[in-house]
Amino acid sequence: MYKIGLTGGIGSGKSRVADMLAEWGASVIDADEISHALTAPGGAAMPAIAREFGPQAVAADGALDRAWMRDLVFREPAARGRLEALLHPLIGLHTEQAAAQARGLYLVFVVPLLVESGRWRGRVDRICVVDCDPATQIARVQKRSGLTEPAIRRIMAAQAARATRLEAADDVIVNDGATSPDTLRARARTLHDRWLALAGAASQPGGKAAGTPE
């Protein structure tokens, strides 16, 4: 199946684009949704997180205490690597299981840290970045989450620089503060139609999709 890696910084609007692609028939696998399920009450990652970080990492309902973890990572940057070492193998396993069951027109992996991980270039046929300026990111995240600007900037600092993401992109969807919902939809539709054509070509004899042996 033809594979798209969809990414973008926090607040860029990648989830909104992913929802549109799903509406039009793509199979969408969201790494963030998998991560949240793994760290929800009873989530598969929670026993290992509790062992690694202690009971203070677990909220009263049994989920990951995200505010506590954000504070820890700010004070001890190495804690991010410890958490990712627990989560990433599980996310990878669940991602592959979902991909094996996908039956859409093509497959979209929504991965916030796609560029940062360095593991996705060979797993997807194209990388698409949903892009906006930092001020727009901050405004959107403040509106939806109530996080302070310093907290948001810390999250942004842990992600790839905007220029780095754009350099890795095969396709870019601009979703800045001036982009209307209709314009965003039109931009996403243009790429959807392009990917459908590429998926069709890859499925023909002699066509090749990511992960296919030479």
UniProtKB/Swiss-Prot annotation:
- The record lists the organism as Bordetella parapertussis (strain 12822 / ATCC BAA-587 / NCTC 13253)
- What metabolic or biological pathway is this protein involved in? Cofactor biosynthesis; coenzyme A biosynthesis; CoA from (R)-pantothenate: step 5/5
Positions binding ATP in this chain are G11, S12, G13, K14, S15, R16
| Catalytic activities | 3'-dephospho-CoA + ATP = ADP + CoA + H(+)
Q: Which GO terms describe its cellular component?
A: cytoplasm
Protein name as annotated:
Dephospho-CoA kinase
| UniProt domain DPCK: residue ranges | 3-202
* Matches recorded under SUPFAM superfamilies: P-loop containing nucleoside triphosphate hydrolases (SSF52540)
Function description: Catalyzes the phosphorylation of the 3'-hydroxyl group of dephosphocoenzyme A to form coenzyme A.
The family database entries (PANTHER family) matched by this protein are listed as: BIFUNCTIONAL COENZYME A SYNTHASE-RELATED, DEPHOSPHO-COA KINASE-RELATED
Q: What is its EC number?
A: 2.7.1.24
**Cellular location(s):** Cytoplasm
Keyword set, alphabetical order:
ATP-binding, Coenzyme A biosynthesis, Cytoplasm, Kinase, Nucleotide-binding, Transferase
Which leading EC class covers this enzyme? Answer: transferase
- Give the top-rank taxon of the lineage listed in the UniProt record for this protein: Bacteria
- Main site of residence? cytoplasm
Any single biological process term in GO: coenzyme A biosynthetic process
Tell me its family: Belongs to the CoaE family.
Which molecular function GO terms apply here? ATP binding; dephospho-CoA kinase activity
Q: Which Gene3D superfamilies match?
A: P-loop containing nucleotide triphosphate hydrolases
From the record, give the transmembrane residue ranges.
none
